[in-house]
């Protein structure tokens, strides 16, 4: 403050700090302004689609034989989706996109075995500290992995806030937003931005709810798939070994979104060396629930799978279980996606 008053300091920019930190930093004077969410500064927070495309072309030119594989490598659903203002252009997370390109370059054009930088995974204890109780943590995770959204207030995004408010239950969405864990769907709701964060949050959910994820449950099914390519055992294994661990009362709130996310997390855990994944993928006929596509340069290239999950009420169970073939309308829906 003294330096600005004397004229020795004209402007001081602070980057990479949370508003809660800024509140402490500027508590002695009231001449600080948060510029993060101003339209002119939004693109500083990540890569635009144009910038990410140029970045990929540079990496392809420098570390591979050229740009012929551009469309194959251009996987948008793992690293993009960050929107820092309602209606703003979605951005790529610069940290995890650079992680992918770095691994891609080291492998001389090979797809990294791990698509998620482990440094992004927050210790589950930290989530508990933010929410202050196990009950609050479970409630927050339910909202994100089951309901796929968290309501928020737009004015809270641009306000300075202190440590007490940061840990307030009603402020969780904004706290997660500034930690890079959620993004804006619209003026009212936040969501997980991409498959990377969905995978991380499903992992949190499983750990917090004591869902066993050990290899003995899943490897005996996923390993044979890499040879025989039989998809049905993967689905059966998911329902028996994963969903079979949940108590009956949990199924009162489980929905299609949870099924999509948890099935994706399980498959990607064991098959990410061979396939890339997408959920709620836009197609000419609508949005498919789940898709897995063989990675270019592997034996699985052009081996594509598409799944459409259907939710039925308990009273319909007997009729559905009696069927010995898919319903014609469901087959037609999947064929339209293909």
Kindly give the residue locations of the regions a language model identified.
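Substrate-engagement module of ASCE P-loop NTPases
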Residues: 1-10, 337
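A generic structural signal for well-ordered alpha-helical segments enriched in polar/charged residues
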Residues: 2, 54, 58-62, 265, ...
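Short alpha-helical segments and helix-capping/turn motifs at coil-helix boundaries
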Residues: 2-5, 77-83, 167-174, 178-179
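Short, surface-exposed basic-aromatic patches at helix termini and helix-loop junctions that form
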Residues: 5, 30-34
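Amphipathic alpha-helical segments of the small helical/lid subdomains adjacent to P-loop NTPase cores
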Residues: 21-27, 35-102
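Extended alpha-helical interface modules used as scaffolds for assembling large macromolecular complexes
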Residues: 32-33, 90-327, 331, 338
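Amphipathic alpha-helical transducer elements in NTP-driven molecular machines
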Residues: 49, 53, 328-334
